[in-house]
Amino acid sequence: MLQQFCLWKWLAVGIAVATILASSLAQNDEDCKLARTGPPATIVPIDEESRNGTILVDNMLIKGTAAGPDPTIELSLKDNVDYWVILDPISQRLYLNSTGRVLDRDPPMSIQSIVVQVQCVNKKVGTIINHEVRIVVRDRNDNSPQFQQQRYYVAVNELTPVGTTIFTGFSGNNGATDIDDGPNGQIEYVIQYNPNDKTSNRTFDIPLTLSGAVVLRERLNYEEKTRYFVIVQANDRAQNLHERRTSTTTLTVDVLDGDDLGPMFLPCVLVNNTRDCRPLTYQASLPELTDPVHVNPISVTPPIQAIDQDRNIQPPSDRPGILYSILVGTPEDYPQYFHMNLTTAELTLLKPINRDLHQKFDLVIKAEQDNGHPLPAFANLHIEVLDENNQKPYFTKSTYEGFILESSPVGTTISDSRNLTSPLQITVLDNDVEETKDPQLHLFLNDYNTFFTVTQSGITRYLTLLQPVDREAQQLYTFSMIASDGVQESTPVTVNIVVIDANDNSPTFSNISYNVKIYTDMGPGEGVIKLTAVDADEGPNGQIVYEILAGDQGDFIINDRTGLIAIAPGVVLSVGRSYALTVKASDSAPPAQRRSSITTVYIEVLPPNNQSPPRFPQLMYSLEVSEAMRTGAILLNLQAFDREGDPIRYLIENGDPQQVFNLSQSSGLLALGKPLDRESTDRYILIVTASDGRPDGTSTATVNIVVTDVNDNGPVFDMFLPKNLSVQEEEANAFVGQVRATDPDAGVNGQVHYSLANFKNLFRITSNGSIYTAVKLNREVRDYYELIVEATDGAVDPRRSTLTLAIKVLDIDDNSPVFTNASYSVLVPENLPPGTVFLQIEAKDVDLGSNVTYRIRTQEALEYFALNKYTGELSLLKSLDYESFSDTDATFTFLVEAFDSKGTMPPGLATVTVRVKDMNDYSPVFSKTLYRGMVAPDAVKGTVITTVSAEDQDPPGTPASRVRYKVDVVQFPYSASIFDVEENSGRVVTRVNLNEEPSTVFKLVVIAYDDGDPVKFNTTTVEIAVLQPSVIPRFTQDEYRPPPVSESAPKGTVVTVVMAAALNQTIVYSIVSGNEEDVFAINNRTGVISVKKPLDYERVTSYELRVQADSLQVVRSNLRVPSKSNTAKVFIEVKDENDHAPVFTKKMYIGGVSEDAKMFSSVLKVKADDKDTGNYSAMQYRLIIPPIKDGKEGFVIEAYTGLIKTAMLFKNMRRSYFKFQVIATDDYGKGLSSKADVLVSVVNQLDMQVIVSNVPPTLVEQNKDQLIGILERYVQDQIPGATVVVESIGARRFGDGYSEEDYTKSDLMVYAIDPQTNRAIMRNELFKFLDGKLLDINKEFQPYLGQGGRILEIRTPDVVANVKKQAQAVGYTEGALLALAVIIILCCMPAILIVMVSYRQRQAECAKTARIQMALPAGKPASTAANNLYEELGDSTILFLLYHFQQSRGKKSVLEEGDRQRVISSFASRAIEAHKQSNINGSLNNNLPKSSSNITFLSDENPLTTQNPLYVEGVTQSPAAAGLLRKRSDALDTLSPMQLVLRDASLGGSHRAWTVPAHVTKRHAPGSLSRPVIMDPVQWQQERLKAENEGTENQHSRVDISSPLFQKISGPTLTVKEKARQFEQQALQEMKQVKSPDVKSTRSPTHSICLQERDNTLEQSPKSVFASPCLRSSPLSSPTPCEVVEPEPSAVPSVIITHHDYPEELSPPPTRKPTPPSFRIKKPVCQSFLAPQTKGEVTENIPDPPKTPPPPPPLLPPPPPSPPLLPPHPPTLPLASVPSSSSLPSTQHLSPAKHSKSPAKQPAVPPPAAVPEPPPRRELKGILKNIQNLAAIEKSVANMYSQIDKNHVLPKHISKLKPVATPELPTPEAAAEHNQQNGNLSCVVEELEKRFPSQSTAL
């Protein structure tokens, strides 16, 4: 046993080991394999230029472990070229190895992929597996495009058409290249804006951006611009626009001059701002009867010359010559007298002209080009024929006297009077010339010709001033004047010119100042000194007036005429006083021209005897002397005064070492002795002495003389600066050199300014003398400049000096070689041997040191031609054969280019056209060697006799193959004189009218020749026989005019019959002309002409046939004999038939009509054309249109004009459209018809745009169709087939509200209609279509709007703009309303404050009234007590109820009071019973669930129970929210599902029972309010009948319907107190409405808190069921039944109010059974409303109550007293007793389905808790002592008040409603119980009356 156990144990161990080994071996086999699926190779992408260490493969996913103590695999890299990859074997990760290098996919590295092998060695098994890793290098856009050349060049002729490709140099490898790959390497070319050449980007374009072909976009004009610099940008096509790289180059486009302008006559005076010349008239004059030899060529002024405006056509040999001619002239026989040389324009006289016949010639001369493209120019030539010069010129006067003001400027005309108002007219005539014409005389002055000159043209001449005159120098100029006509001279006349004085001289004193000594013994009036001033003028200008200006101090006076200064009267002189009088001398000229000067008189008062030394008037004298002062000029009077009068001697003691000044020793006058030079000495200080010869008789004075500067020195250039300068061409603002100049003068006279005297447009100089180039210089235009620099100082009359600089322009390689001809054309004869040189081309490079080489650029031409690269000789490589080419292509055209071997500029290009000349190989060959013909002896000129024909075997279309004919005049000259052959057709005709003898035979030799080179020819002979007249038939009529033939005439219809007669001859008829289309046929024997082919009047209206009659003998010989008699004309008229239907000009007419269009407004005009004529083309139009509105057609059409008009109004029909058909019938509606479609779309100004142009509306109206066509084309570019319609054309409207009009501009209002949508295109879209193309539209509008006419803007119509403006602005009415609202709010603020204060007062009264104590008998217990009623209602509610109760008691009738007492008693009993259930041990149990009891106002029909939303938890319908619904809904007439019958219509309402539930438990809400129930009226009645049959057994299972009256409304939910306060507010509002005298009918119950206006009794019921349908707030919806929830059996008993005390006569029997509810919409009166709804699902969710309290309710004043509505003592109705809860009969309820959910069970009542001792309170008296928990009773009473009819106003007429099912009568026990409760209620009321009398709480 043990052995077996060991055996089995070892066997198990072996099996385990084997299993482990097997699994290990299997695992080893999987190592080195990939752990992933998919392809074996690993492919990863990587961007080029990735950084070193970038992870290539995160994990190779190779099975096995390469790390650890026992690795299973070993990894390594193989084929790792350049070691780009690094392997981490542990993590199986691959890295990029780019250390010290960059992974670049682009050349030169060009690494596009890297392939390595990851080798895996299985260390367990030993197998090796290689895993391929392929790394794809992705391209990055890291290279910019690179152009192969820095610049590109192309030359374009200005006549190149727009759209021509002018440059393809960017194609291939010549453009830009990008070494990137894919889109990064693809190149696009675009033209960029060049700020230095602003028109280049719009002149050229690259439409195909990938090809780079430059296309001409705008027309070139060599005269405006000769070169363009086009910036071409090359960019790659990277996907990300921001990553695209670009580079630019410049394409230089030279515009070549083309022959687009004609000649122009010189001289050309341009019209302002144009290139047009003003009309030019050449003048010439010829003496009469002059021999042409003496005057030829005629002298013309100016010489006639015209030049071609295209002055630079290359090569010069292509420039056209100019041909001159006289186009037209008057008189018409001018060609007899004049001839103009065709090339030189020399005018020659052909014969003498008699002036009696012709006095003048007015000719129009023409100059045109000689190249077949004339482009003529015109000028006028006026030639005067002069009378024979045998009369002397003569003046009309013998003496002329003129006047001129001496101050007149040069050029003034001499006047004929002293007032200088009119010029002096010198009239000179010559009797050889008409008096009205200029005699063209020359006038000469024999003297004073440097002062005066005379005009040299016209009959009247004028003398003008050449230089100023001075009257003071010479007052009268007298000279003689002679007139000469070149042959004879006139008699001299005398001319006296009087110079009128001008006030040009000022009065001058002899001295600058005067010194006078006077003595104290001199008396008043005694003279002191007499001053004299001199004025050279005459008259008032020379009369001098003196006056003392200052310094006299009132002691001296002066005579204004004599200048005598005397002592003033009454003056006593004092010794030692001195005076300095300033005296002015003025002339008597007018004040504006008056001149004056002043002097100073120094007066010193001395005693009668004086022994003192001489004294100078001043110790210091200061004066300024100009350095230009003349020598000898008196500078200063230094006269001293000596009292004794001793002689004084004056000397200069110091300060004048060079003796520049002279001082008179005796007079003291200081004069200038030598010239002054400020630049050497600018100041002198002289010490002057005066001595009388006595000791101490010397005094001194100092004279300070400042030498002022004059501009006597010019600027001097620095000659050490270089004057030979150089500058490189093609550089703007390049520095050229520097100059410097100095001026020794002072101030502005020494300030130096530089300027250039020449080449100012090429160079500029700065203020410091630096010279720069102003523009780029072109050495090829000019390589050397002598620039003159001028330096000026700053003086008024500046001095100048100049310096000449030599500037050499240095060359750069900036020009390509230019061929002497832009194109070469050569004619090469065929069959020339190879090597023949047939053309030499030449190109020149204006750059220095250039060597030009040539080559053929077109590869195809290299097969035939060779070009010597140095000489430019073109030669043949092989012989050319003309016949080897096609008929039209025997021409080679290829490009040759010239290179500058050392330069970098693009090559010059030229076009060579080689035309192979066909050599004439064959001669023409006639078809016959002999031709015969016959002719009548009287044949007229041009009669065709026969036709010769020859052919040439040369290639067709070549000149060598063209055959022409002529007559050999050498052989048979007479025959050649009467017969001829037509050159091209070969027809032999008579040259003259024949008159030959019959039977004569003539021979004529005809030559056929070609136009080949050389010309080859051949001859043939023609024999012409003249027939006898008798054998020639003669027609009976020369013309036949048959009746018109209908165009529908069938074939064979006879047209007419022609007849001819001949002697013994059989006549054969034929049609010889006019029947080219073979329309008619003639019977050759009978002469009957018939129709052969159908006629078409629309194509040919008439035929003119020429028929010929010949004898049968002649016909048989295949000849014809035309003569005068054997031919006749047949005129056949074709009669039109109505064989063409009308054709409309369009298949569909599209138009529009405005919404505000009036009746019969024009919409559009249709037109149909008919090829027929007459009435057959007269149209009648009609419409096929279905009725549009009220059975009327919307449009009508004028029957004969096609004008469609409106027949209805289209108001508010925008975006509508109408489609109909128009039918056109010709022959005024009796003929053929055709139809077209018409589309009319209704638009308004919202669809329109206004096109404002600067031309008048009339011009727009005239060109409306053309302008609309242009607009339509641009709109159709966006929307094919669109039509543009004109709405109106008027004056431009502008200003505020577009109320102003400008008739110089126009508004064109248009809109466009889309044929796809049949509606107007949106206004914004139309604006985009037109505004984006405004420039192009203006270009096309230009021919129609005139010069300068254009579109100014495109805007929206003024109506749309005004609507927008009005929508943005608040009107005055709105503003006034807003202001009124603000005022009302401000006025309401005091009222709000009063309400708040009153509310506080009411709260205080509420607290007092709440302490009312009342004792009531015990009621019957109920199943569930009401809980927390006091807290739920709040003190405000109690206050309101008491207030309302007291007001009602005091103002209502006895009947109303009794009803109210019964209600209160019954309600109070129920409240106490409910209170006892919630009272445990005298305390209020707050943990019990809230009551679900109901208070129901019951009508005499089935009670309908509803919940009171005031106490329902979670209901969001607050009075505020209900107010929202009231705004959105209408009140319903009834909510009951029964139709009631009322006796009086004034009684409103449905008399339904409405139950106000106290509260619904939270857990009841989901089941009662969220479950939808759908019930229609039929289902409702069935359910109702079913509920009636259930009886009392189902009483406990009936459901209590939760009120679904309110839908879920977003907003805050309210607490119970807040709801109570809002309920109070609502009750006050309803009371006010009910008591208002306006209310005519009772309100229907539309809200759970709305009270029925009827009298009710209280009845206790265990439960009541709500059976009213739930309605939504929509006023248009129907009632929808809601789900009914069955309450628990222990539901709170309800207090039921039933009718009582109503007379039976007021309750009529029912007239019909109740029906489902009908609704009547009326004004809402309740807080919330229910709206009808057809059928729907109602789901309500009651949210949680809000946390924010509502605002306090407004306080209302007490309602006014209402009169009683019933008699004071009405009979009472029998009262039903209230049964007990166990025996209460079933009332009429509507109980829906039994599946309604039941509420959850109520929680258990907790055990009583210890109640703390209440605070002390006032001792109660009487019955109130026995009432426990008085507070709870007070709350019950308050609840009672809230449910009483607050608006207890009985209606005037009450109709008692009959219930559907009579309710069971109450039992006697129930009645007794009810009576007992009524009695108790009376006691309660009496006790309340005693304890709390009624009080008013008026606000």
Curated annotation (Swiss-Prot):
Disulfide partners: 32-120
Keyword terms, alphabetized: Calcium, Cell adhesion, Cell membrane, Disulfide bond, Membrane, Repeat, Signal, Transmembrane, Transmembrane helix
Membrane-side (Extracellular) residue stretches: 27-1376
Skewed-composition ranges (Low complexity): 1774-1791
Main location: membrane
Biased composition (Pro residues): 1706-1717, 1743-1773, 1804-1814
Organism lineage string: Eukaryota, Metazoa, Chordata, Craniata, Vertebrata
Location within or outside the cell: Cell membrane
Gene Ontology biological-process entries: cell adhesion; homophilic cell adhesion via plasma membrane adhesion molecules; inner ear development; sensory perception of sound
Boundaries of every Cadherin domain copy: 38-147, 148-265, 278-395, 396-509, 510-616, 617-717, 719-819, 820-926, 927-1035, 1037-1144, 1145-1259
Gene name of this polypeptide: Pcdh15
Membrane spanning stretches: 1377-1397
Function of the protein: Calcium-dependent cell-adhesion protein. Required for inner ear neuroepithelial cell elaboration and cochlear function. Probably involved in the maintenance of normal retinal function.
Record protein name field: Protocadherin-15
InterPro entries given in the database record: Cadherin-domain_protein, Cadherin-like_dom, Cadherin-like_sf, Cadherin_CS, EC_dom, EC_dom_sf, PCDH15_12th_dom
CC per GO annotation: plasma membrane; stereocilium
